[in-house]
Amino acid sequence: MKFKIIRLKDNSISEKHANECVAQAKTFGIDVDYFDAIHGSEYLNHLDKLKILPKYKFKKNRIGVYGCFLSHYYLWKQCVEDNIPYTILEHDGYFINPMPNNVLDNFTDVLKLDNLDPYSKNYNEEIDSASLNKINYINYNNPKPKNSFDKLGVSKHGTGNYLRGAYGYIIKPHAAKKIIDWIAINGFVPADQQIGNSIVDIQVTIPTVVRLHPAYFGQINKLSLTGNPELL
C-alpha cells in the first residue's frame, strides 16, 4: 500500500499542516509521500488534458474545489496504474492511531479512516475518548447529508451517501476505476462528494485512525483552501 498526502506547494498553510501530518505518521512507522496538489487556477488545462467535465457548475471563484478534485483524480489514476491500494490524505489529515493490522482484508472498496463528523461541535471530545483497543469496521453513514438528497431521498449528486471530508481514506484500484468510469459518463463533483456509496462500497474504522488536523477544529470554513480563494 502507498501513502500519499496532497500538499499545495509554496502555500504556507498547506505545507505546514502536511509536514505535521507526515511527521506524525512516522511516529507510527508510516512513510507518507507528498503529492504536489493541482492549483485550481490551472483547472481548465487539466480538464482539457483529461477530457472530463464537471457534472454541474461550481460556485463562483471556487477554484480550490477544482484543484482539490483534480489532485484526488490524478491519485485515483495512479492507484489504478500501480494496481495497489492507496491511502490518500489531504494536508488537513492527521494520524492519531497506527494503521490496523490486516486493514486491507476488512473492506471492499473504500475505507474512511474517521467515523466521526469533523463539523460536529463534539468532534474533539469524541476523538479524545477513542481507543484502538478494539478495531471495528462498519458501513459508512454520512452524519449530516445536508441538502444532498431530495424529498424522496434521491441523491442530488447521483453519488449517493458521500464522504464528509476526504482528508483520510484508503481506496483499492478497482474502486478507483469505478469512480473514474462514473466520471467519464456523468461528469465530476467535488472530491469528497465524488466518493459516494452509489458508486463504491464505503466502510469506516471505529475508532478513528486519521482525524481532521486539530488546527481546523471549529475553523474548517475559515482555513479551507477550497472555500477561500484568497488563501491560495
Residue map of PLM features:
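An acidic/histidine-cluster motif and surrounding catalytic segment
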Residues: 1-89, 93-232
